């Protein structure tokens, strides 16, 4: 009625689109959003926010076919607007179709200037979802434009190094592969300097030295040099100190590590950096057999703002509480702590026999927990089939709810990695329905929805 009275057919596009969105009438909504973009391409962020909201509330998955049909119709036209390539990139990132996202990003950059950041967005999203080959292509598109007048050149140079490292970590790799990445990181630092803007590559190089190339002393010197660098912001300095404390723990120097963690706690009393330092310091106490002090720290951290930190604290507090003997012998519990320290230091050949001993001779509480740690060790050694078998047996036999829940969650993660998605989905469903009180139920629900959305996307693409 307002349009008729004003004699303006394009009036109230947003308002009408929002109304149809709330009514879930997506067939009526999309043409209004398309017209909005035609009149004002700068509203793309606004439109994608609305579409994200619609997708998150679309329980029957009726909006994706409408979006796909609309994009197909628009992009078949000869001279369609660049903003629709931008919309196509956004949508294909939602459904993780990185190749199609890259195609539209290329088209967009052929039509418009200053759109290289789109490739950066694709690369970061692809890395998060382990689509490393597509991430590499996206970075190469940026690097292909050269250094001159290219503000995304350095982020792409850094990103491609990180991408290569993360890709190697997914499966057994030769030392020579890690040496090559370390060499490229060293060349980058020589070319662009040991400055605060390049701390991320320095940090990556330290990780390569420490955990992949058996050169922890080189890593320690590098991190010490970084910490002394002038003009570091407080957050970066804290992250470097945390990385160095982790390294000192790995190098069997828990006392120096504890000093650094304590400094981090005091410098960050009410944020996740401080909470994480407190958690790691509590783990050091647990490794050393100071069980009651460690439990007291875990109890404090149950209310941490970070879900990951609070979940770890809850798990460790519960494990110690259930297995500590106030008037009895805690040698098995202390042995478990020492064994976990060896696991932290990646001494797998020594860890596995110790875990087998704990599994075979300890009470069910410690035996089941040791089985979880053995599964983690096997995964770290890329023995996924053996780990999956162990976890499957544990979830069936254990009488401890929190152990069963963790076994289910670990097993579901392995099934996802092995592309056995139906089994993973069923395991996540079990966590949500049968273990709703566990620390994993919320994350399991999210992962279940992701798998379901992925299935529907495959159906739509057929």
Residue positions per predicted region:
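Acidic, polar-rich low-complexity tracts and alpha-helical solenoid repeat scaffolds
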Residues: 1-462
């Amino acid at each position: 009625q307002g349009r008729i009275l004003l004699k303006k057919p394009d009036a109230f596009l947003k308002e009408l689109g929002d109304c149809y969105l709330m009514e879930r009438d997506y067939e009526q909504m999309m043409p209004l959003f398309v017209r909005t973009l035609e009149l004002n391409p700068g509203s793309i962020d606004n439109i994608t926010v609305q579409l994200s909201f619609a997708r998150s509330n679309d329980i029957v998955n009726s909006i994706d076919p409408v979006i796909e049909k609309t994009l197909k119709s628009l992009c078949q036209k000869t001279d369609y607007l660049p903003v629709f390539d931008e919309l196509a990139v956004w949508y294909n990132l939602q459904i993780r179709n990185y190749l199609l996202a890259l195609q539209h990003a290329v088209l967009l950059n052929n039509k418009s200037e200053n759109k290289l950041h789109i490739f950066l967005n694709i690369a970061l999203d692809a890395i998060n979802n382990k689509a490393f080959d597509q991430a590499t292509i996206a970075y190469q598109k940026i690097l292909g434009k050269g250094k001159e007048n290219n503000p995304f050149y350095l982020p792409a140079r850094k990103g491609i190094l990180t991408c290569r490292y993360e890709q190697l970590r997914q499966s057994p790799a030769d030392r020579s592969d890690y040496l090559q990445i370390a060499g490229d990181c060293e060349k980058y630092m020589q070319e662009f300097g040991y400055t605060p803007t390049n701390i991320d590559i320095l940090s990556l190089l330290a990780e390569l030295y420490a955990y992949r190339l058996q050169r922890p002393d080189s890593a320690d010197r590098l991190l010490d040099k970084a910490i002394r660098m002038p003009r570091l912001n407080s957050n970066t300095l804290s992250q470097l100190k945390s990385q160095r404390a982790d390294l000192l723990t790995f190098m069997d120097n828990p006392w120096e590590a504890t000093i650094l963690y304590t400094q981090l706690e005091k410098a960050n009393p009410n944020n996740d950096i401080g909470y994480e330092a407190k958690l790691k310091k509590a783990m050091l106490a647990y490794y050393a057999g100071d069980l009651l002090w460690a439990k007291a720290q875990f109890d404090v951290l149950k209310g941490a703002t970070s879900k990951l930190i609070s979940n770890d604290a809850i798990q460790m507090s519960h494990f110690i509480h259930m297995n500590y003997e106030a008037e009895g012998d805690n040698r098995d519990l202390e042995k478990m702590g020492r064994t976990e320290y060896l696991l932290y230091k990646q001494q797998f050949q020594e860890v596995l026999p110790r875990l087998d001993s704990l599994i075979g001779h300890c009470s069910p509480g410690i035996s089941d927990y040791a089985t979880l740690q053995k599964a983690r060790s096997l995964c770290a050694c890329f023995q996924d089939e053996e780990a999956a078998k162990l976890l499957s047996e544990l979830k069936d036999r254990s009488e401890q709810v929190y152990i069963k829940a963790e076994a289910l969650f670990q097993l579901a993660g392995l099934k996802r990695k092995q592309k056995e998605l139906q089994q993973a989905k069923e395991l996540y469903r079990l966590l949500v329905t049968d273990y709703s009180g566990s620390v994993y139920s919320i994350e399991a629900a999210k992962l279940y929805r992701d798998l379901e959305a992925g299935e529907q996307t495959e159906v739509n693409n057929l």
